[in-house]
């Protein structure tokens, strides 16, 4: 898991997300508390439960982007899900326990990569021996010591050449394990155990024998390393470690939680809204979920929920779920100045992306200060007049602004363009001023 301090986490998030200090600090503290909890005594550690977070803010201000960046920083099992994708147990659709199953699959993959990384050196040695066996088959009769010594010397010469890369382009015939065909079986609630047994049965039936293939040594070496590393990984230990990782360090990001709030009086069963909230409750407060890898306890999994809450309020969530999200963070709406910073400050900003894309065609693009101000102002004005979609409006405005250059770039190699206030005005003013055009085009 990540050992970064809250200040380091916020600094890393600042490189990609403009503003929203409160949200960044809350997320950073929650992530650091995962590490702090693991430093406690085992008995006391069980009593410390995570403080789940509810992020509230209009669309396009950075809620989902914080989740994406946090996934890379966490170095722990992390899953982002849309709350709208789930329905109440017993109805058609995904049930919420699938979140934990998917999170466990992510942990298995993460743990497998870590374990394969640890035994990579041994795997490389085994792969090297297999390639040398293909280049220099061992003699059937081993009784002649002279031939044996000569073969050993030749093997060392080839080993040296192999390590120096002199044999990379040489082709060899080698037996490579065939990839297994995965079979996914949908099961009704309560029958997961039977489904897991069926999947194991099909998996064993579908194991194809190794196939002899002709390939270059460089490609064969990579494949054999993966194959040998997989053999060295103990599957039972892998599952135990992965489940431990999920239970102690897992993070679930629930996006669009406002869309499952109950709106007004409804007569029928609300299976995709209040029903989902009721099903989420046991997960958030702690329960045991059956997965194909084993039983997973959710008591110490951190849940971060987010929503725009434009058509609903946080108080529209069922009271029990509100109580399980004690930390509330409100994200601020973006101003024209924020748009200007978004265009220039983040790593791989929008302007840098367009400059790099056009450079592949030999076209030089320069964004003048006045041009960036005009783009930010145009995006902000359209948001104010029509639907406010936050920073996502910049993508629409930039694409419309760069449309002509992008279309003609392949025919104008060596050309240079300066995007200043006049250029922006010429291409966007009519669209920005005309509310009907803004609504449909920008």
From Swiss-Prot:
SUPFAM superfamilies: P-loop containing nucleoside triphosphate hydrolases. ATP binds at residues 18, 60-65, 255, 320, 392. Signal peptide: none annotated. The keyword Nucleotide-binding applies. Transmembrane segments: none annotated. InterPro entries: AAA+_ATPase, ATP-dep_Clp_protease_ClpX, ATPase_AAA_core, Clp_ATPase_C, HslU, P-loop_NTPase. One of its GO terms (cellular component) is HslUV protease complex. Keywords: ATP-binding, Chaperone, Cytoplasm, Nucleotide-binding, Stress response. CDD domains: RecA-like_HslU (cd19498). Residues 136-156 are annotated as: Disordered. It comes from the Bacteria. The keyword Disulfide bond does not apply. GO terms for molecular function: ATP binding; ATP hydrolysis activity; peptidase activity; proteasome-activating activity. It is found in: Cytoplasm. Pfam families: AAA (PF00004), AAA_2 (PF07724). One of its GO terms (biological process) is protein unfolding. PANTHER family: ATP-DEPENDENT CLP PROTEASE ATP-BINDING SUBUNIT CLPX-LIKE, MITOCHONDRIAL-RELATED, ATP-DEPENDENT PROTEASE ATPASE SUBUNIT HSLU. A double ring-shaped homohexamer of HslV is capped on each side by a ring-shaped HslU homohexamer. The assembly of the HslU/HslV complex is dependent on binding of ATP. ATPase subunit of a proteasome-like degradation complex; this subunit has chaperone activity. The binding of ATP and its subsequent hydrolysis by HslU are essential for unfolding of protein substrates subsequently hydrolyzed by HslV. HslU recognizes the N-terminal part of its protein substrates and unfolds these before they are guided to HslV for hydrolysis. NCBIfam families: hslU, PRK05201.1. Belongs to the ClpX chaperone family. HslU subfamily. This is ATP-dependent protease ATPase subunit HslU.
């Amino acid at each position: 898991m990540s050992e970064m301090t809250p200040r380091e986490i916020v600094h890393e998030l600042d490189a990609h997300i403009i503003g929203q200090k409160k949200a960044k600090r809350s997320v950073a503290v929650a992530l650091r508390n995962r590490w702090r909890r693991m430093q406690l005594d085992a008995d006391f550690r069980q009593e410390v439960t995570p403080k789940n977070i509810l992020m509230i803010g209009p669309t396009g201000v950075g809620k989902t982007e914080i989740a994406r960046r946090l996934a890379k920083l966490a170095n722990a099992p992390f899953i982002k899900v849309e709350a709208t994708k789930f329905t109440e147990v017993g109805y058609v659709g995904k049930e919420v326990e699938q979140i934990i199953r998917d999170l466990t699959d992510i942990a298995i993959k993460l743990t497998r990569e870590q374990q394969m990384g640890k035994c990579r050196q041994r795997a490389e040695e085994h792969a090297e021996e297999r390639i040398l066996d293909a280049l220099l088959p061992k003699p059937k009769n081993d009784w002649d010591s002279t031939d044996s010594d000569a073969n050993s010397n030749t093997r060392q010469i080839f080993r040296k050449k192999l390590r120096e890369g002199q044999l990379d382009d040489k082709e060899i015939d080698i037996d490579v394990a065939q990839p297994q065909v995965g079979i996914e079986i949908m099961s009704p609630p309560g029958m997961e155990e039977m489904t897991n047994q069926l999947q194991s049965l099909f998996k064993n039936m579908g194991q194809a024998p190794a196939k002899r293939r002709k390939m270059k040594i460089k490609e064969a070496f990579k494949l054999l390393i993966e194959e040998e590393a997989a053999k060295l990984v103990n599957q039972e230990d892998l599952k135990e470690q992965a489940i431990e990782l999920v239970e102690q360090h897992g993070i679930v990001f629930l996006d669009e939680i406002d869309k499952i709030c109950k709106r007004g009086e409804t007569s029928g069963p609300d299976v995709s809204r209040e029903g989902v909230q009721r099903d989420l409750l046991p997960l958030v407060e702690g329960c045991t979920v059956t997965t194909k890898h084993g039983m997973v306890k959710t008591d110490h999994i951190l849940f971060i929920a987010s929503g725009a809450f434009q058509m609903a309020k946080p108080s529209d969530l069922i009271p029990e779920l509100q109580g399980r999200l004690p930390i509330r963070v409100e994200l601020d709406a973006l101003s024209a100045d924020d748009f200007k910073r978004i265009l220039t400050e983040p790593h791989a900003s929008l302007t840098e992306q367009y400059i790099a894309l056009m450079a592949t065609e030999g076209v030089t693009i320069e964004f003048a200060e006045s041009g960036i101000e005009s783009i930010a102002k145009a995006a902000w004005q359209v948001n104010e007049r029509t639907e406010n979609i936050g920073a996502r409006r910049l993508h629409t405005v930039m694409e419309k602004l760069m449309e002509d250059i992008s279309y003609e770039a392949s025919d104008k190699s060596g050309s240079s363009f300066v995007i200043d206030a006049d250029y922006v005005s010429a291409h966007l003013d009519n669209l920005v001023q005309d509310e009907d055009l803004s609504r449909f085009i920008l």
